[in-house]
């Protein structure tokens, strides 16, 4: 990308960190703690915008599970993180928060949270520490790549804004020459908070291998919204719990019906299990119905495998067990229990506690006729296939997969093609589910990049 020339001589700095999220702030902490003059640039008006968003509903800092299990959460990069996490894992993250005056607790799921559940107090304390170490923040400065002379090129996101430390700038452009640069630009999700993936073509133009950014920890659109029995008839009576008794019916409408959307979009599915046979995934948890499909923590846990399945095959099928605590035989027994004058819905609520979204999805996928065929209904309750056809757009995702390939950087994330330039955080090619794994890895990579930058400056 050819950049215009800035209207003044380039500003000289020792270290430029681009991105004021957790990865950039951690790199700044390492460097400033060693006495290095650090300048942090970000396009947003204030630091940690996505970090604060992550704290809505409770900031999940890390996870308490053993490191050998923890590292497996990083899918294809589990071997890489098995060597990274011993230096910065849950223990170090909890101790670091304590140093900032933030006490933590371990929830019933093993996730670690601040005691007050909030992100803002931790971020304020962190920023105060960095300012005390003379880190300078330059907000509303959008990096647009390198100019023809190799300087970092910035455009003011608000050309009339005052920019701390560089200029009370009324000019829209700024060139910065840094001895060392740490890029912590995020991935491709939540563009309005700064992670727009605009950096991808600029790095590729410099010969850096960057895997395409893809949605991770995302929702999915449903495809076929009606099922038929495997025998194409409701006359047969399959064995209780026969998982092959239902399959998607081609040619029916796709997506939820308007009735389902109006009644159940935003409603939770609690205490259900999902099986994705293609990836040998089976787990119990929660998710919610959306106007286009499904999302939530249990969906996020299998989202990488579902995305891969869809990319390879055009769709992915998950199987829901709506009553994982109950055997197929017991379910069939309760379905067959005489209901007298009660409606089927009242009967299922009374005997099986099936109501709300769980009952709604059965009517949606089976239809009224099949709902009154007890064997088919019982089989569906225990093994309900749902076809997913697409991920939701990357900008809706919690995080993204893809990024700078790990074989394009050294052990401290220095770009092999551009010495003195380091990468950190979500812009690297890795992904993980929610549960504290994302933030832990973002901070761990920022710490390593900061250490690498320090070694580079001292070499």
Identify the residue ranges that each predicted region occupies.
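N-terminal Rossmann-like FAD-binding beta1-loop-alpha1 element of flavoenzymes
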Residues: 13-40, 450-454
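Residue-level detector of alpha-helix initiation sites
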Residues: 17, 21-22, 46, 187-189, ...
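Glycine-rich FAD pyrophosphate-binding loop
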Residues: 32-56
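Residue-level recognition of phosphate/Mg2+-coordinating polar/acidic sites
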Residues: 33-34, 46, 67-69, 86, ...
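A conserved beta-strand/loop capping segment in the N-terminal third of enzymes
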Residues: 52-122
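Short beta-strand to alpha-helix junction loop
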Residues: 81-89, 108-128, 190-195, 221-225, ...
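Predominantly flavin-linked oxidoreductase catalytic cores and closely associated redox partners
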Residues: 121, 129-350
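A conserved FAD-binding loop/helix module that cradles the flavin
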Residues: 189-202, 206, 429-458
């Amino acid at each position: 990308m050819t950049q215009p020339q800035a209207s003044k001589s380039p500003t000289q700095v020792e270290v430029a960190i681009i991105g004021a999220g957790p990865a950039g702030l951690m790199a700044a902490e390492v460097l400033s703690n060693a006495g290095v003059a650090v300048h942090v640039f970000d396009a947003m008006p204030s630091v940690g915008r996505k970090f604060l968003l992550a704290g809505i509903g409770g900031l999940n800092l890390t996870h308490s599970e053993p490191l050998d299990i923890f590292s497996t959460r990083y899918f294809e990069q589990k071997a890489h993180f098995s060597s990274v996490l011993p230096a910065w894992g849950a223990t170090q993250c909890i101790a670091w928060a304590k140093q900032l005056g933030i006490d933590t607790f371990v929830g019933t799921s093993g996730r670690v949270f601040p005691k007050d559940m909030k992100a803002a107090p931790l971020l304020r304390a962190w920023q105060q520490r960095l300012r005390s170490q003379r880190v300078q923040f330059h907000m509303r400065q959008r990096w647009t790549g390198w100019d023809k002379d190799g300087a970092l090129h910035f455009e003011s996101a608000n050309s009339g804004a005052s920019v701390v430390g560089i200029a009370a700038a009324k000019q829209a452009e700024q060139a910065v020459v840094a001895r060392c640069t740490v890029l912590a630009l995020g991935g491709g999700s939540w563009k309005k908070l700064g992670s727009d993936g605009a950096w991808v073509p600029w790095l590729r133009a410099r010969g850096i291998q960057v895997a395409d950014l893809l949605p991770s920890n995302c929702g999915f659109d449903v495809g076929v919204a009606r099922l038929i029995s495997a025998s194409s008839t409701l006359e047969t009576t399959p064995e209780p719990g026969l998982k092959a008794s239902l399959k998607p019916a081609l040619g029916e409408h796709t997506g939820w019906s308007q009735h389902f959307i109006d009644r159940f979009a935003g409603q939770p599915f609690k205490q259900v299990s999902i099986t994705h046979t293609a990836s040998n995934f089976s787990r119990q948890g929660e998710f919610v119905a959306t106007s286009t499909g499904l999302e939530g923590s249990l969906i996020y846990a299998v989202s990488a495998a579902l995305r891969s399945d869809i990319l390879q095959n055009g769709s992915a099928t998950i199987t829901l067990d709506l009553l994982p605590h109950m055997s197929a035989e017991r379910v069939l027994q309760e379905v067959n229990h005489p209901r007298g004058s009660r409606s089927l819905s009242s009967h299922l609520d009374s005997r099986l506690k099936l109501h709300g979204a769980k009952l709604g999805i059965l009517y949606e996928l089976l239809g009224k006729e099949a709902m009154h065929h007890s064997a088919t209904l019982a089989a569906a309750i225990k093994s309900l296939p749902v076809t997913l056809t697409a991920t939701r757009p990357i900008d809706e995702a919690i995080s993204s997969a893809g990024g700078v390939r790990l074989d394009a950087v050294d052990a401290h994330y220095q770009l092999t093609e551009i010495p003195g330039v380091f990468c950190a955080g979500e812009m690297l090619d890795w992904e993980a589910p929610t549960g504290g794994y994302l933030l832990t890895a973002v901070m761990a990579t920022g710490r390593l990049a900061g250490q690498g930058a320090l070694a580079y400056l001292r070499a």
